[in-house]
Amino acid sequence: MTQFTHINASGEANMVDVSAKAETVREARAEAFVHMAPETLQLIVSGQHHKGDVFATARIAGIQAAKKTWDLIPLCHPLLLSKVEVQLEAIEAENKVRIESVCKLAGKTGVEMEALTAASVAALTIYDMCKAVQKDMVIGQVRLLEKTGGKSGHFKAE
């Protein structure tokens, strides 16, 4: 079994030393979903939501969150991201919004947490903007879709 990289021999949490690692191009994609009532989704899609453009706000929130992941999650390295992209798609037949994020850099550690944070915070932003209309929305299915680069190589979710 693979050992946890953030735990030392004494069981204490520590930030991993990546100084000796080779710099490689790394990319990660993640997704999240927000399930809601058809009426709530229609407010978003039609642009009639009283708080403004929900997708634009969620996109910016996701991008900002990726850049601040190191500040939110203990032991994450501050990274010089070269790309953060957040796409939002209304899936009206299923009454949900799909969020997909992509983070990329040339560096010594991966960007999986940044991609997951971007998708998660974009979903939270949708909830925040729509909670006055509907409080029982469900955020879920947050997952890593794919990652490339680094020692562990390529991963793609099934």
Curated annotation (Swiss-Prot):
Query: What is its pathway?
Result: Cofactor biosynthesis; molybdopterin biosynthesis
Instruction: Identify the InterPro entries for this entry.
Output: MoaC, MoaC_bact/euk, MoaC_sf, MoCo_biosynth_MoaA/MoaC, Mopterin_CF_biosynth-C_dom
Q: Output the Pfam families linked to this UniProt entry.
A: MoaC (PF01967)
Class in the EC hierarchy, top level: lyase
User: Molecular function terms in GO for this entry?
Assistant: cyclic pyranopterin monophosphate synthase activity; GTP 3',8'-cyclase activity
Give the EC number(s) under which this enzyme is classified. 4.6.1.17
Per UniProt, which keywords does this protein have?
Lyase, Molybdenum cofactor biosynthesis
Report the function annotation for this chain: Catalyzes the conversion of (8S)-3',8-cyclo-7,8-dihydroguanosine 5'-triphosphate to cyclic pyranopterin monophosphate (cPMP).
How does this polypeptide assemble, per the annotation? Homohexamer; trimer of dimers.
PANTHER family membership: MOLYBDENUM COFACTOR BIOSYNTHESIS PROTEIN 1, MOLYBDOPTERIN COFACTOR SYNTHESIS PROTEIN A
Tell me the protein family, please.
Answer: Belongs to the MoaC family.
Protein name stated in the entry = Cyclic pyranopterin monophosphate synthase
- Species source reads Vibrio campbellii (strain ATCC BAA-1116)
The encoding gene is: moaC
